[in-house]
């Protein structure tokens, strides 16, 4: 992916194919096939790899992949459309639409911060962004991955200790558009946001901490992406 980001498509294609050949489980094969598909020069080959990615995603069929189904079916539909196969294009467009809607993830969910809060407190939108202090956030963000919440806590503004709270949404929520279908297909980080409050129902203390070097790398990446937050 680093090669792809640097515009070295040929080397990126070679490495993605190597990842496919070395994949050891269905999730790895799904991800690798998806990226191999992106580097195909013709529609039939692109379609073949997209359908391969879809099959392995269907084999996995958990919350790490279901958010990718709309995009996968849509890309497959467009391939069939380009090939003049109206029936298969229509079928896959309909399948893409069938997976739209609110996420089905049941949690548990976590929110990382440096704020000192208590069980029963409500987290609400309207605070300033951890990454762009001048930006007032219209949503409250959370994740189903405790280590992701731990990273958010480490990157949060303030000098207090990192805290990861177990939270329950009090209203509907959506996939975080800042990460969904961006670097990876769908929302494998299970990152969400809501305009409704989150209720704190507990706290966890056990998650994988980032090293100072890793945190600095994250801060540098966030500095580069300033101005790109979808609010």
PLM regions: where:
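Alpha-helical segment of the N-proximal tetratricopeptide repeat
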Residues: 1-14
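Flexible helix-coil transition and linker loops at the boundaries of alpha-helical arrays
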Residues: 18-26, 57-67
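Conserved small-residue packing positions in alpha-helical repeats and bundles
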Residues: 1, 34-37, 77
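TPR repeat positional signature
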Residues: 30-33, 73
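Conserved NAD+-utilizing ADP-ribose enzyme module
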Residues: 81-82, 87-107, 112-114, 130, ...
């Amino acid at each position: 992916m680093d090669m792809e980001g640097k515009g070295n498509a040929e080397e990126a294609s070679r490495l993605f194919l190597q990842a496919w050949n070395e994949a050891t489980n269905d999730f790895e094969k799904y991800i690798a096939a998806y990226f191999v598909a992106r580097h195909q020069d013709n529609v039939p080959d692109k379609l073949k790899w997209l359908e391969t990615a879809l099959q392995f995603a269907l084999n996995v069929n958990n919350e790490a992949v279901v958010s990718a189904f709309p995009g996968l079916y849509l890309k497959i539909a467009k391939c069939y459309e380009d090939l003049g196969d109206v029936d298969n294009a229509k079928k896959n467009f309909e399948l893409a639409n069938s997976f739209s809607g609110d996420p089905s993830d049941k949690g548990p969910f976590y929110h990382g911060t440096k704020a000192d809060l208590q069980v029963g407190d409500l987290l609400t939108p309207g605070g300033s962004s951890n990454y762009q202090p001048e930006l007032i956030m219209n949503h409250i963000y959370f994740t189903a991955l405790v280590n992701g919440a731990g990273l958010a806590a480490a990157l949060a503004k303030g000098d207090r200790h990192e805290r990861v709270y177990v939270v329950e949404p009090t209203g509907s929520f959506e996939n975080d558009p800042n990460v969904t279908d961006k670097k990876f297909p769908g929302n494998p980080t299970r990152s969400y946001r809501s305009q409704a409050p989150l209720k704190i129902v507990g706290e966890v203390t056990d998650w994988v901490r980032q090293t100072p070097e890793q945190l600095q790398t994250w801060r540098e990446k966030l500095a580069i992406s300033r101005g790109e937050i979808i609010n």
